[in-house]
Amino acid sequence: MVVRSTAAPPTPWSKDLAEPKIHESAYVHSFSNLIGDVTVCEHVLISPGTSIRADEGAPFHIGAATNIQDGVVIHGLEQGRVVGADGHDYSVWIGDRSCITHMALVHGPAYIGNDCFVGFRSTVFNARIGDGCVIMMHALVQDVDIPPGKYVPSGAVITNQQQVERLSNVTEADRAFAKQVVEINEALREVSPGATNNGSRIAANQQPTPSSSTNTSGTSEHQSVGNMSLNGDLYNQVRGLAAQGCTFTAEYANKRRFKTKSWLSAGFVEGHSADQIIGNLNRVLADHAGEYVQLIAVAPNSKSRAAEIVVQRPGDSAPVQTSTTASYSNNGNRSNGTSAGSQAAAVGGDLTSQIHALASQGCSFTAEHANTRRFKTQSWLSAGFVEGHSAEQIITNVNGLLGQYPNEYVQVIAVDPHSKFRVAELIVQRPGETGTLSTKATASARRSGNKVVNTASGGDVAGQIAALASQGCSFTAEHASTRRFKTQSWLGAGFVEGHSANQILANIQAIAAQFPNEYVQLIAVDPNSKTRAAEIIIQRPGNNAPVQTATATSSFSGGTKAAPSSNGFGGHSSGSLSGDVVSKVRSLLMQGYKIGTEHADKRRFRVKSWSSCGTIDSTQEAEVLRHLEGCLQEHSGEYVRMIGVDEAAKRRVLEEIIQRP
């Protein structure tokens, strides 16, 4: 038998209680409980699961545009009052535009001023909080009077006035955090199916006041979140999250799905810098015009959502603003690969460099296609495997698929060879786009003008250097003639000063001008280990020198095509070594690591059964390279991988395939 109970059980004080006075524009969820003499002013938001009981201590006042979030409890003692801003006595006074967040407890007598923020699970009892104060999470504020504009940190216990005197002032970052929490919660104003503008859940022993009608006020959305795509803070948020290594995805929903939080995936938002991410996000906004779109930031370690930002709502048309700083390129203009107004994503050099990087990690590739209707529901159809042992072959085969599915969406899927999970989803064609992926995204750019060579995407270079600079890396430069470059005998060119990517790029360009017709590379040095974090060649005397970089994604040329004998993975069937392998050998030797090799035929490679070729005892770079080339020739037609070993820790620090059949 079902046991039924009232929404708010009667108490000894609940007889002959006054009725709540709720403004017609207030937004009170039907799953919240209001009892007694409670004044709810205009544009107040009261979320589900709140309990506001003015039965023992009364009255309560909740000021205009105040936000009461899920699970908040507001109660008062029978004795004890505070003087409100209007000069009358109240058990609990909450001022205008304040925010009481999830699971917080406000127990009267208590006074909370205007523009205040009370964090998750914090408690305010017998206290007076001045205007503009910010109380963070799990804090206790009791028996004190806090002056305006003070900051109470998370977990603080403030129970005497001496502790109050030591509190710091609120900063802009604190206000920005409070604003973000309020904006996200206020989305309930237009999405919750159980809410009405003034339909509060009154206790069973009370009748609603005549003013509590069920008609919808035209001002119900007055405090809803605006078009965040027009907010310049979004760019700073994305830049900060990207600097933390977060990856980004997007989701969209129509009005019906938005009400039930049934978001549909819009895929990954690719990019190495905030400009690239915002540019790709603008494409998503254009694809889902008239719908809700939110950007998801995923933490790299916990794989959990670090942020959810609604960037578009129905009726919004302006694109997300990007940084006004132009990306670095050798002709002073913004690279077509990152321009928001570029043609197909397929012609973007950024996609080409990403495929190069993924191929160098040994990923396998598949393709999917969808028409406009299927794209909206993410119902992709398989287009089969994309064959190829090198990035150039893969790109060529992808271009063939683009011709098979004109006026459709086409995306390339990169699959990790070990975990068999998708590591990237790249949309390379959209309806109305006719471009193709280029294997030489900036070859023409490098032939003209000055000698400074940038990547397939100038913004990518700035993004890489910005990321390295944000990690605290310092930068130096080296140069070498053609003869010295062959033996990797670089000469120092001094430190590269600068506090931003643009300053560093400008200074390295000035250094490159001092050494015309020579190789110049930029070195990023890790501040903790004092080892090289990246090596980026930015100038070459001609177009025949091999691309060399310490990481798979930091090649400055980005479009150099492998020689016909190259297998596309850093090794050559002829027994010669690529510049990338030479660079990594040099880096391993500089850090004191030993280098060894292993080989496997096709059958053994499938089951990961490698045979050791032994460790190279020498620490001389030339001798190690000679041993590696000999190993490649000895095991021609087989897989060969290079091993970096830390003998002190007895562990491998590098495993890289340098030859494939």
Swiss-Prot record:
It is found in: Carboxysome. Identified as 2 proteins of 70 and 46 kDa in gels. They are probably the result of alternative translation initiation. Residues 194-204, 319-342 have a biased composition (Polar residues). Residues 578-661 are annotated as: RbcS-like repeat 4, SSUL4. Residues 456-541 are annotated as: RbcS-like repeat 3, SSUL3. Keywords: Bacterial microcompartment, Carbon dioxide fixation, Carboxysome, Photosynthesis, Repeat. The keyword Lyase does not apply. Residues 221-341 are annotated as: RbcS-like repeat 1, SSUL1. Residues 205-220, 549-567 have a biased composition (Low complexity). One of its GO terms (cellular component) is carboxysome. Its main location: other. InterPro entries: CA_gamma_LbH (IPR047223), CcmM (IPR017156), Gamma-CA (IPR052265), RuBisCO_ssu_dom (IPR000894), RuBisCO_ssu_sf (IPR036385), Trimer_LpxA-like_sf (IPR011004). Residues 350-431 are annotated as: RbcS-like repeat 2, SSUL2. Disruption phenotype: Single gene deletion does not form carboxysomes, and does not grow in normal air but in 2% CO(2), called a high-CO(2) requiring phenotype, HCR. The keyword Glycosyltransferase does not apply. One of its GO terms (biological process) is carbon fixation. It holds the Pfam family RuBisCO_small. One of its GO terms (molecular function) is structural constituent of carboxysome shell. CDD domains: LbH_gamma_CA (cd00710), RuBisCO_small_like (cd00307). Gene3D superfamilies: Hexapeptide repeat proteins (2.160.10.10), Ribulose bisphosphate carboxylase, small subunit (3.30.190.10). Residues 192-228, 312-345, 545-575 are annotated as: Disordered. Probable homotrimer. Full length protein (M70) interacts with CcmN. The C-terminal RbcS-like domains (SSUL) bind to holo-RuBisCO, as does the M46 short form. Belongs to the gamma-class carbonic anhydrase family. Functions as a scaffold protein for the assembly of beta-carboxysomes, initiates carboxysome assembly by coalescing RuBisCO (ribulose bisphosphate carboxylase, rbcL-rbcS). Produced as a full-length and a shorter form; both forms are required for correct carboxysome assembly and growth. Beta-carboxysome assembly initiates when soluble RuBisCO is condensed into a liquid matrix in a pre-carboxysome by the RbcS-like domains of probably both forms of CcmM. CcmN interacts with the N-terminus of full length CcmM, and then recruits the shell proteins (CcmK) via CcmN's encapsulation peptide. Shell formation requires both CcmK proteins and CcmO. CcmL caps the otherwise elongated carboxysome. Once fully encapsulated carboxysomes are formed, they migrate within the cell probably via interactions with the cytoskeleton. The N-terminus has a gamma-class carbonic anhydrase-like domain (CA), while the C-terminus has 4 repeats that are similar to the small subunit of RuBisCO (rbcS), called SSUL. The SSUL are connected by flexible linkers. The N-terminal domain forms a scaffold on which CA and other carboxysomal proteins assemble, while the C-terminus binds RuBisCO. This is Carboxysome assembly protein CcmM.
